[in-house]
A protein has these predicted regions:
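Segments forming oxygen-rich coordination pockets for charged ligands
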Residues: 1-207, 211, 215-220, 224, ...
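Short beta->alpha junction loops/turns
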Residues: 34, 184, 249-250, 273, ...
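A generic structural signal for alpha->beta connector loops
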Residues: 199, 220, 264-265, 291-292
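ADP-ribose/adenylate-binding Rossmann-like module
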Residues: 203-206, 242-243, 247-254, 258-283
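Conserved SAM/SAH-binding loop
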Residues: 226-231, 251
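Short amphipathic alpha-helix with an adjacent loop that forms part of the alpha/beta core around
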Residues: 229-239
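Adenosine-phosphate binding glycine-rich loop
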Residues: 266, 270-342
């Protein structure tokens, strides 16, 4: 069962387009409210699974104290509408299956769903409406889906069709960020673990066979032994969003940087102090000029940590901020300005 947030007002934990999954065995994947509403959603999801209906909408309003359940003590001051959509073997697990395939192949994709009937379509950069349920609103859904594919994001809107006025929810799927770790030493393990927890696709490479042990890393990570000179042949660097060079070997790090300098990887992190960065830059010569605008060294945010886990957190946090076009500033400063001391 898929649960999509299709609309919000006021303050909510997540916004329109967020997705959570429920299984017939009462397993949950993801969060929509931070834990406040998931139990009720699960109850309704299981009822829907046992019924002949394809979808249902639940609304949760915590904006006032009149509501005896959702308005008592939550303090969120927001309204959330959630579309529950039956996704099972009978539907081929659509539309999620097509969105997942597109994400894995790094194609842009979107889906449009009729909120009342559960009819849907999926469009990708390679096709329009390839995965679609039968229904009288197919043409309207394809139009909305194509628009969402072009614009991105998520939206719910009313649309006039040949069969009346319909509420259509549409959302564009985003591919998982891809992270390349050049160096599979012990300190790469927490970096891979944090990134995997965020849902990133992680590849770890090393030129030393003794370090190439997939058992040390999360199950879905790729761990590959490489000849640094042919790294670009082993790994499709065009599909890498961020790379971190962390082999702890000066010559090897320089060779990794030389390969990445020829690539278009937008974020290249380098572990180690500034003096080491400058020495490597000098050895790179003219290649350093192309790398400089993309080089984050020393890698990571200044969080004050010294343990491998704290350093890994600072690295992944900086990459997360970079991928979202943020600077990694505190929310208190972003939303309220600097706080004056009392």
């Amino acid at each position: 069962m898929a649960a999509f947030i299709i609309g919000t007002e006021g303050s909510t934990y997540r916004k329109c387009g967020a997705l959570m999954l429920f299984s017939a065995g009462a397993e949950r994947f993801g969060l929509l409210s931070g834990g406040c509403l998931e139990g009720d959603l699960q109850d309704h999801a299981l009822r829907l699974l046992a019924s002949r209906e394809r979808c249902a909408v639940r609304s949760y309003d915590s904006r006032g104290s009149d509501d005896p359940v959702w308005g008592l003590g939550l303090g969120c001051e927001g309204l959330m509408r959630v579309l529950l959509l039956k996704v099972d073997e009978h539907s081929g697990y659509e539309p999620l299956a097509s969105l997942l395939r597109a994400s894995e192949s790094r194609q842009a994709a979107a889906t449009a769903i009729d909120v009342a009937s559960g009819e849907f379509t999926v469009c990708t950069t390679a096709s329009i409406g390839r995965a679609a349920s039968d229904g009288q609103n197919a043409s309207a859904l394809e139009t909305v889906c194509a628009q969402r594919l072009a614009e991105g994001g998520a939206r719910t809107a009313w649309l006039d069709t040949l069969h009346g006025r319909r509420e259509i929810f549409s959302v564009a799927a985003e591919h998982a960020p891809t992270l390349l770790l050049c160096g599979a030493g012990p300190d790469a393990e927490p970096v891979a673990e944090f990134a995997a927890r965020l849902g990133w696709q992680v590849t770890i490479v090393d030129h030393r066979s003794a370090y190439v042990d997939a058992a040390r890393f999360p199950a879905h990570c790729r761990v590959i032994e490489v000849d640094i000179a042919t790294l670009g042949e082993k790994i499709d660097l065009q599909h890498i969003d961020a790379a971190v060079v962390m082999s702890h070997h000066l010559t090897a790090d320089g060779r990794y940087l030389a390969v990445l300098a020829k690539s278009n990887v937008a974020y290249v992190g380098l572990l180690g102090p500034a003096a080491r960065r400058e020495r490597l830059a000098a050895e790179l010569g003219d290649r350093a000029a192309r790398l400089r605008p993309r080089l984050y060294a020393p890698v990571g945010l200044d969080l004050g940590g010294r343990t491998p886990e704290a350093i890994a957190l600072s690295i992944v946090a900086e990459i997360q901020a970079f991928l979202n076009g943020r600077r990694g500033a505190p929310f208190s400063a972003v939303h309220q300005g600097s706080l004056s001391p009392v």
